[in-house]
Curated annotation (Swiss-Prot):
InterPro entries: Uncharacterised_TM-17. Keywords: Cell membrane, Cell projection, Cilium, Cilium biogenesis/degradation, Glycoprotein, Membrane, Transmembrane, Transmembrane helix. Transmembrane component of the tectonic-like complex, a complex localized at the transition zone of primary cilia and acting as a barrier that prevents diffusion of transmembrane proteins between the cilia and plasma membranes. Required for ciliogenesis and sonic hedgehog/SHH signaling. Belongs to the TMEM17 family. GO terms for cellular component: ciliary membrane; ciliary transition zone; MKS complex. Part of the tectonic-like complex (also named B9 complex). The chain crosses the membrane at residues 45-65, 78-98, 110-130, 142-162. One of its GO terms (biological process) is smoothened signaling pathway. This is Transmembrane protein 17. It is a multi-pass membrane protein. Glycans are attached at residues 13, 23. It is found in: Cell projection, Cilium membrane. It comes from Bos taurus (Bovine). The gene is TMEM17.
């Protein structure tokens, strides 16, 4: 199951704009770019542990919500239930995109993971952690802090991985362009030599 083409193209364009290294003037020829793996082991390990931590976070959040539900004002009841539902839905999508983007080195999926983490998950969990009106219990604070640490680490490591992936793709493009130009120059030389012989 892959992202629809318009979404992939927009995320690809976004990631090329944000993550490409503008200081580079040309491709680097240090290593063979076709053989280099750019997926991040640290990000993958974080995603792996996050998949096991998230059910624990969810169960503890539901239990703590049930314990303090009667003392919360009505608007906080609605807000907290909505946030937990949103975090649950977003987390499933986010982890899927993170796995696909990192393991298969797909830039649009990893960019989607990064955007969901930075723009949706992190603000929601920070709201749950720092809002004084929610009267957070100690277990709740502990699991929110751990989840925030996971998210912060994943945002930073996904950014670095995306930057590396985009630079590798740019290098591949420049090398293919160079090879194509070299081949066309060779063809032109052959045509010139044939014309000169005639």
């Amino acid at each position: 199951m892959e992202l629809p083409d318009p979404v992939r193209q927009r995320l690809g364009n976004f990631s090329r704009t944000v993550f490409s290294d503008s200081n580079r003037t040309g491709p680097e020829y240090n290593e063979g770019p076709d053989n280099e793996m750019v997926s991040s082991l640290a990000l993958q390990m974080s995603l792996y542990f996050n998949t096991y931590f998230f059910p624990l976070w969810w169960v503890s959040s539901i239990m703590m919500l049930q314990m303090k539900y009667s003392i919360l004002p009505d608007y906080y009841k609605f807000i907290v239930v909505t946030i937990i539902i949103l975090i649950t839905l977003i987390e499933a999508i986010r982890l899927y995109l993170g796995y696909m983007g990192n393991l298969q080195e797909k830039v649009p999926e990893l960019a989607g993971f990064w955007l969901l983490s930075l723009l949706l998950q992190l603000p929601l969990i920070l709201f749950l952690l720092f809002n004084e009106g929610l009267t957070n219990l100690p277990l709740e604070k502990a699991v929110h802090i751990i989840f925030t640490i996971f998210l912060t680490f994943q945002v930073v490591s996904a950014f670095l991985t995306l930057r590396k992936m985009v630079n590798q793709l740019a290098t591949r493009f420049h090398l293919q362009d160079f090879d194509r130009l070299s081949a066309s120059r060779g063809d032109m030389r052959r045509v010139r030599s044939c014309i000169e012989e005639i």
